[in-house]
Amino acid sequence: MKLLAVTVLLLVICSLEGAFVRRQAEEPNLQSLVSQYFQTVTDYGKDLMEKAKGPELQAQAKAYFEKTQEQLTPLVKKAGTDLLNFLSNFMDLKTQPATQ
C-alpha cells in the first residue's frame, strides 16, 4: 500500500514539474513577430521597386493603362448618356402632372 502511495506521489510530482517547465518555456514574443513581419514586407517592397525600375515593366504598365483607357472610355460615355436620359425622364414625369 505504501509502495502504491509513493508511486502515485512520484507520478503527481513529475507531472506537476513537467507542467512547470512547460510554463517557463520561452514563448514567441509578439513584438519580435510583428517586427519580423514588417521587415519581410519592407524587403518585398524594396524588391518590387527594383523590379519596377526596369523599362520593360514600365512599358507593359503603360500599354496596359492605354488599353484599359481605350476600353473604358466608350463605356463611361455610354453610362453618362444613359444617366442623363434617365434623369431627364424623371424631369419629364414631374412636369407632366403640372401641365394637365
Curated annotation (Swiss-Prot):
Keyword tags: Cleavage on pair of basic residues, HDL, Lipid transport, Oxidation, Secreted, Signal, Transport
Annotated localization: Secreted
Subunit field text: Monomer. Interacts with NAXE and NDRG1.
Listed GO CC annotations: chylomicron; spherical high-density lipoprotein particle; very-low-density lipoprotein particle
Residues annotated with Methionine sulfoxide modification: 49
UniProt key word Cytoplasm: no
GO biological process: cellular response to lipoprotein particle stimulus; cholesterol efflux; cholesterol homeostasis; cholesterol metabolic process; cholesterol transport; diacylglycerol catabolic process; high-density lipoprotein particle assembly; high-density lipoprotein particle clearance
Coiled coil: none
Family named by the database record: Belongs to the apolipoprotein A2 family.
Gene (name only): APOA2
GO molecular function ontology, one term from the record: phosphatidylcholine-sterol O-acyltransferase activator activity
Purpose of the protein: May stabilize HDL (high density lipoprotein) structure by its association with lipids, and affect the HDL metabolism.
Tissue/organ expression: Plasma.
Signal sequence range: 1-18
Protein name: Apolipoprotein A-II
